[in-house]
């Protein structure tokens, strides 16, 4: 009788302890859509640059983890006078950020991001071409949902200021938790 009681108590304790470590040492990877809104001195681009976002997250323990993010957006422009094309331009935006993540419960995690952003503009009109680029700090925040144990839905916003150009990027993705 004592052995049965001891064994059942031990099994109950181990099962409770295993529920508390549901997130430790787990990883997730997600890929998704990114769209930047570019603004300078009150003016915005006619078409927002679009691209992709890739995130990797590692959970250190039940609550805390780290997350890394890479985002890329691009938009090409053609310049016309009437129906005649006389030039072309490209806007590219890259960012690499990382930061802490905090798991609120089994389904929801919040995170913050800090890192670097790089913007590049190239244009060629007739026989002339110009380009400019700038690297600056980027920061953001996001949320990850785990509606199923191995499925991740990710949503985040990132902001950077490249001299007088302000870039805000929304990202929405899905991925796998393992």
Swiss-Prot record:
Subcellular location(s) per record: Cell outer membrane
Signal peptide, first to last residue: 1-23
Topological category with respect to the lipid bilayer: Multi-pass membrane protein
SUPFAM superfamilies the record matches: OMPA-like
Main location as per UniProt: membrane
Keywords: Cell outer membrane, Membrane, Signal, Transmembrane, Transmembrane beta strand, Virulence
GO cellular component: cell outer membrane; host outer membrane
Family matches, as InterPro entries: Bact_OM_Invasion-Related, Enterovir_OMP, OMP/PagP_b-brl, OMP_b-brl
Functional summary from the UniProt entry: Promotes the invasion of pathogenic bacteria into eukaryotic cells by an unknown mechanism.
Protein name: Attachment invasion locus protein
Family per similarity comment: Belongs to the outer membrane OOP (TC 1.B.6) superfamily. Ail family.
GO BP annotation list: symbiont-mediated suppression of host complement activation
């Amino acid at each position: 009788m004592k052995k049965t009681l001891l064994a059942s108590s031990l099994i109950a304790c181990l099962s409770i302890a295993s529920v508390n470590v549901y997130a430790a040492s787990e990883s997730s990877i997600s890929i998704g859509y990114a769209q930047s809104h570019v603004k300078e001195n009150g003016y915005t681009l006619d078409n927002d640059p679009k691209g992709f976002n890739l995130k990797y997250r590692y959970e250190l323990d039940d609550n805390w983890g780290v997350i890394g993010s890479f985002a890329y957006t691009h938009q090409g422009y053609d310049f016309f006078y009437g129906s005649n094309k006389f030039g072309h331009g490209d806007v590219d935006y890259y960012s690499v950020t990382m930061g802490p993540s905090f798991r609120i419960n089994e389904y929801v995690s919040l995170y913050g991001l800090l890192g670097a952003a790089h913007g590049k503009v190239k244009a060629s009109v007739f026989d002339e071409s110009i380009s400019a680029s700038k690297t600056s700090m980027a920061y953001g925040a996001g949320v990850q949902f785990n509606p199923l144990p191995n499925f991740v839905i990710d949503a985040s916003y990132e902001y950077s200021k490249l001299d007088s150009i302000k870039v805000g990027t929304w990202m929405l993705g899905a991925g796998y938790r393992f």
